[in-house]
Amino acid sequence: EYPDFVPSSQAVSLPVENILQNPELPTGCESVALTMVLNYYGHRLAKTEIADRYLLKDPENFVTRFKGDPHDISGDGIYAPGLTETARRFLSEQNAPQKATDLTGTPLSELYPYLDRKIPVIVYDSVYLKTPVDVAEYVTDGETWHFYHNEHCIVLCGYDPLNRRVLVSDALSGLVWREERRFTEIYDARGRMAVVIL
């Protein structure tokens, strides 16, 4: 974090209002990140509405469902495929014009054009950019997915190419600039999971 950081004139910064996940959703970073983006598009969601009404849960599956309960500290999380479906469920119910798209596999630099078009991106990283630790796996459709201790999900809402920083709306830390190199390392290590709503 860089509290004294002053962005350059080349910086892009989207007005994504931050929502802190605690105390209601200690493991609900993904649903809070989705809520921030949906609210950016004019939906008026309370902090827990996505988690309570739209998130499908499962005791084992963290890929297409939320493993555990986001209201509980022992909950784990939900990966991009499941979060994309959660967004689609909400948007369909609202008859909203937007569509959710899973961009998993996209390099970080290729997400910047979305920001240029005023489209924030939900991105998976780690809590406070700590090194992810592989703690579980789940197989679905013949593909093995790994779950990591320190798993986290934030909204990428800006970047500063001159100073090599990215702006994130983090449900734990607030709105913060992060060093691009380290952020990219974690993003890549986590499988480059990203979701956009267009």
Give the positions of each predicted feature:
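A short acidic/basic microdomain associated with nuclease active sites
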Residues: 18-19, 99-102
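Structural recognition of the beta-strand scaffold that forms the well-ordered cores
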Residues: 28, 100, 120-125, 155, ...
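...with weaker cross-activation on analogous glycine-rich loops/strands in unrelated enzymes
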Residues: 87-89, 93, 103-126, 130
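Noncatalytic regulatory segments and standalone regulatory/sensor domains
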Residues: 136-148, 154-198
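A mature extracytoplasmic/lumenal domain signature
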Residues: 33, 104, 125-129, 158-160, ...
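Loop/turn elements at helix/coil->beta-strand transitions in domains of secreted/extracellular proteins
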Residues: 94-98, 117-122, 163-165, 192
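Active-site-adjacent structural segments surrounding the nucleophilic cysteine of cysteine proteases
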Residues: 1-89, 93, 127-129, 134-138, ...
